From Swiss-Prot:
This is rRNA adenine N-6-methyltransferase. Belongs to the class I-like SAM-binding methyltransferase superfamily. rRNA adenine N(6)-methyltransferase family. It comes from Staphylococcus aureus. It catalyses: adenosine(2085) in 23S rRNA + 2 S-adenosyl-L-methionine = N(6)-dimethyladenosine(2085) in 23S rRNA + 2 S-adenosyl-L-homocysteine + 2 H(+). Keywords: Antibiotic resistance, Methyltransferase, Plasmid, RNA-binding, S-adenosyl-L-methionine, Transferase. GO terms for cellular component: cytosol. One of its GO terms (molecular function) is rRNA (adenine-N6,N6-)-dimethyltransferase activity. NCBIfam families: Erm23S_rRNA_broad, erm_C_23S_MT. GO terms for biological process: response to antibiotic.
Length: 244
């Protein structure tokens, strides 16, 4: 990944007042271990170390790593790793949560990484508002892949005025809560295929006409442009039955 591109995409929140307003929506306690994606200048990191057991900040910009370390000089329950989050290997044998004010231009890559390559039980991210809405849109493949693994909530708006430099759009604080996967391991490949055919409206490649009509009826779907994730799972289960 190009480090320069990432650095140029960063927008910081530095006002303690605004940070405190955001932190009120994040469930943390003194036993939590946190991985922070992008420490920036350490403003959120400072709040995290005061609330949690231990914070590991992952920051690709070595200058910002030093800035964060200097800001937290009075604390010892943290480490700052000068690493690319997309190459980072999350631990598989401990409990932790994730927080990050993530760059807009790699939001999809980051969210895929932390949902599918980490075991974090709770994930809090500040993302562009339009991106947050897309994560709840069952017409999009990313949403359908994520909803099988996590429950997604938009917790609050984060106005663009909170940031510097000020972006063109507002952001949101979102929470992803880990749940038992709705797709069994043996069905993962089949689910991936079904999702891509569905979002591309290639219905004839996954159902006959009669199968399609019966599946829609069984799922209680009247409008293909407005279906819930549970209805989508019903369609997938019908597809599996027809393709044993």
């Amino acid at each position: 990944m190009n480090e320069k591109n990432i650095k140029h995409s960063q927008n910081f929140i530095t006002s303690k007042h605004n940070i405190d307003k955001i932190m009120t929506n994040i469930r943390l306690n003194e036993h939590d271990n946190i991985f922070e994606i992008g420490s920036g200048k350490g403003h959120f990191t400072l709040e995290l170390v005061q609330r949690c057991n231990f914070v590991t900040a992952i920051e690709i910009d070595h200058k910002l790593c030093k800035t964060t370390e200097n800001k937290l000089v009075d604390h010892d329950n943290f480490q700052v790793l000068n690493k690319d989050i997309l190459q980072f290997k999350f631990p598989k044998n401990q409990s932790y949560k994730i927080f990050g004010n993530i760059p807009y231009n790699i939001s999809t890559d980051i969210i895929r990484k932390i949902v599918f390559d980490s075991i974090a039980d709770e994930i809090y991210l500040i993302v562009e508002y339009g991106f947050a809405k897309r994560l709840l849109n069952t017409k999009r493949s990313l949403a359908l892949f994520l909803m099988a693994e996590v429950d997604i909530s938009i917790l609050s708006m984060v106005p663009r005025e909170y940031f510097h430099p000020k972006p063109r759009v507002n952001s949101s604080l979102i929470r992803l809560n880990r749940k038992k996967s709705r797709i069994s391991h043996k069905d993962k490949q089949k689910y991936n295929y079904f999702v891509m055919k569905w979002v591309n409206k290639e219905y004839k490649k996954i159902f006959t006409k009669n199968q399609f009509n019966n599946s829609l009826k069984h799922a209680g779907i009247d409008d293909l442009n407005n279906i819930s994730f549970e209805q989508f799972l019903s369609l997938f289960n019908s597809y599996k039955l027809f393709n044993k």
